[in-house]
Amino acid sequence: MPILATTPQAQVRSAVEPLVRSGESPAPVGVIDLDAFDYNAVQMPTRSGGLPIRVASKSIRSVAALRRALEHEGYRGILAYSVPEALHLVGEGFRDIVVAYPSVNRKALRELAADDTARESITVMVDSVELLSLLEGSVRVAIDIDCTLHLPGAVIGPRRSPVRTPEQVSALAREVVRRGHRLVGLMAYEGQVASVADGLPGPVGAVKRWLRSKSMADLAPRRRACVAAAREVADIEFVNGGGTGSLQESAAEGTLTELAAGSGFYTPAIFDDFTGINHKAAAFFVCQVSRVPAPGWATVNSGGWIASGPPAKDRVPVPVWPAGLSYSSTEGAGEVQTPLRGADLEVEDLVWFRHAKAGEMTENVDRLLAVGHDGVDVWDTYRGQGWTLR
């Protein structure tokens, strides 16, 4: 089932417009539709096969949004980006945090080692002996397992870990234990499934669907063997995998004890071509018209918040309200201004965009206007708290 709603609801627009026009919340500003956010939060566990979902904080980047996500049934713990982020979240009262990526931040690792609460709350990720050598004291450790699909002449998927075989898992697991750390988990993320749309038409869509299917078939026995190898060495608390775009496929394999998802709460534009995601767009950013350079054109300040990944059309923000807007073919979405064509707009009018990805939108705003039935709440982003992912 495709995305159910891609434009802001009328009540959301009417709540935000006076705040922007009055200057109380100057544009550009981020907006969260709480009805859609909560709807999406309810939908994801219906695809998780009964497995708990760890909330991927990098896709949310707001403490208030994280709290709301974790209030919903079916969610447990946080999947953080970095040790500094995890330490910050512990300071905010969160516990059960797995850091999804290895850290070489010696200062943060020293802070982790010196803080009893942090050591019990945070699990760090490793994929090599070199990373183990950076750890001090005794900390909770998880091993990252490579889940890429290897085809003749090509590797499909995110290049993450060098640990690919059960033998490699066993060797690194034994080294974790030998050095006095606690091996508590495994991560095995199949990014080439979770982030590859399966609903595109034509030959491109057919190839992507085949890659998703082939990836899961290739990964299942290898991931199962890697998990068994780790369990021979230590009492593993969790095996994490999956993402918003692969919850049902990842859960069905039977190897994982938990899933991860974060983007699904906001449901950015990059998920519009996934057939199994029946969500509603919950996150928008709003820019304001600052000039009308010619009939049929309107230019907004800012707008060019391009998403990470291979440069392509699907990394560009989508103007979704008013309907029918399009970019200039010679300018596109700009850093300081964005010309748009296709609507009868005037100076000070609002234009609503969807970012291509989820958490990256928040790097551009200090706060989010969270619009619900009871009015508008203001949620600080990480940036609004004075820090960013690092």
Task: Give names to the regions the model predicted.
Residues 22-33, 96-99, 117-122, 155-163, ...:
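Glycine-rich tight-turn/loop motif centered on a GG-T
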Residues 37, 58, 89, 143, ...:
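Conserved, mostly hydrophobic/aromatic
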Residues 147-267:
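Active-site loop/helix belt of alpha/beta enzymes
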Residues 292-390:
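C-terminal accessory subdomain/extension
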